[in-house]
A protein has these predicted regions:
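Early extracytoplasmic/lumenal segment of secretory-pathway proteins
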Residues: 1-46, 172
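Alpha-to-beta junction loops
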Residues: 10, 30-39, 52-53, 115-117, ...
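Solvent-exposed coil/turn segments that connect beta secondary-structure elements
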Residues: 19, 41-43, 61, 97-99, ...
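Stable alpha-helical elements in mature extracytoplasmic
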Residues: 19, 23, 40-43, 52, ...
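A structural signal for short loop-to-beta-strand junctions that line the ligand-binding cleft
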Residues: 28, 32-37, 54-93, 118
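Periplasmic solute-binding protein
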Residues: 42-54, 76-105, 128-136
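Short loop->beta-strand "edge-of-pocket" segments that line small-molecule binding or catalytic clefts
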Residues: 109-123
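Ligand-binding pocket segment of bilobal, Venus flytrap-like solute-binding proteins
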Residues: 120-124, 128-132, 139-181
């Protein structure tokens, strides 16, 4: 950031948030002064629908045309009028191989009572529900109320096993040994 600030003659203020919902609450509460926010795709759609974001100037984004095909024309903003993909990836299970002797091959390990108090889950309801639904053999995008209730019940069973719900610094929890999954 220092080099960017020097080169462009600006001062960058970084304000982090631990979840999409926290960002949305800040914006709905009247927080201003943001030039850039980094929500997930579903939250970008909500922010666009609620008029919480300004239109982008395409002349300042020359590399937007070089995005990979699967990142072009996203459903929530197909013409990149309000949003440009910043990153894309997947969620998996990180683990301490000195404690978890068998490489996890399913989400089921996150319900193993041997790891009570040593499990960290992302503080992101979509990711967590998605993982639970996948562990049940269901689509992570299901709208079936019965499956969603079943996922909720599984999360309530898991809750006593979880040390932290963290979307920031989860890597540090694992590296320090505070959690093993």
């Amino acid at each position: 950031l220092t080099e960017f600030e020097r080169r462009h003659g600006v001062r960058v203020v970084v304000d982090t948030f631990s979840s999409n919902e926290e960002l949305l609450a800040k914006l709905q509460g009247g927080a201003t002064g943001y030039d850039v926010t980094v929500p997930s795709d579903f939250m970008a759609a909500i922010m666009i629908q609620q008029g919480l974001v300004a239109e982008l100037d395409p002349t300042t984004l020359p590399n937007a045309t070089t995005l990979e095909d699967h990142l072009q024309h996203l459903p929530f903003d197909p013409t990149h009028r309000y949003a440009i993909p910043y990153l894309w990836g997947t969620v998996g299970i990180g683990y301490d191989s000195a404690v978890v002797s068998t490489t996890p091959d399913s989400w089921a390990v996150l319900w193993d009572p041997r790891y009570t108090g040593k499990i960290s889950m992302l503080n992101d309801q979509r990711e967590v529900f998605g993982a639970v639904l996948r562990s049940m053999g269901a689509s992570m995008n299901t709208k079936d109320p019965g499956l969603i209730e079943a996922a909720k019940a599984r999360l309530l069973v898991q809750k006593p096993l979880v040390k932290a719900y963290a979307s920031e610094h989860y890597d540090q929890l694992l590296a320090s040994g505070d959690v093993v999954l």
